[in-house]
């Protein structure tokens, strides 16, 4: 069974940092692109970061809203995806999800999602 389990959310003051984790199991972690997506209260889902697969050297990509503040990385030995979040702002308050990318030519799908972890940025 393929599973994604996020953790690490919580309450943090503006300007603070958090590191989210996404523990994965049931598939070959290195073969897949992995994504971070968030949903602020009352708003739509927003893609924020990607970690490409081993074949693409685990290169990364970020949305403009988090670039320079957030860093996505992997522990390939433990099959964990991370999101280091720095210089947090009130507008970063959201439920954060990790998702697996699946390629079925000619389309990409986020085919497996975790349950999410909540981040609240407030003083």
Swiss-Prot record:
Pfam families: V-set
Recorded GO CC terms: extracellular region; immunoglobulin complex
Domain Ig-like: 1-114
Coiled coil: none
Keywords: Adaptive immunity, Hybridoma, Immunity, Immunoglobulin
The keyword Transcription is annotated on this UniProt entry: no
GO terms (BP aspect): immunoglobulin mediated immune response
Listed Gene3D superfamilies: Immunoglobulins
GO molecular function: antigen binding
Alphabetized CDD domains for the sequence: IgV_H (cd04981)
Miscellaneous comment as given in the Swiss-Prot or TrEMBL entry: This chain was isolated from a myeloma protein that binds phosphorylcholine.
Name this protein carries in UniProt: Ig heavy chain V region HPCM6
Organism of provenance: Mus musculus
């Amino acid at each position: 069974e393929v599973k994604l389990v996020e953790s690490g959310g919580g309450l943090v003051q503006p300007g603070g940092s958090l590191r989210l984790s996404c523990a994965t199991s049931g598939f070959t972690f290195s073969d897949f692109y992995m994504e971070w997506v968030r949903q602020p209260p009352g708003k739509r889902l927003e893609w924020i970061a990607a970690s490409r697969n081993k074949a693409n050297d685990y290169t990364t990509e970020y949305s403009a809203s988090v670039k320079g503040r957030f860093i996505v990385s992997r522990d390939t030995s433990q099959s964990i995806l991370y999101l280091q979040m720095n210089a947090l702002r009130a507008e970063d308050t959201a439920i954060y999800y990790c998702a697996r990318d699946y390629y079925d030519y000619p389309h990409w799908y986020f085919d497996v999602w975790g349950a999410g972890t909540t981040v609240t940025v407030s003083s």
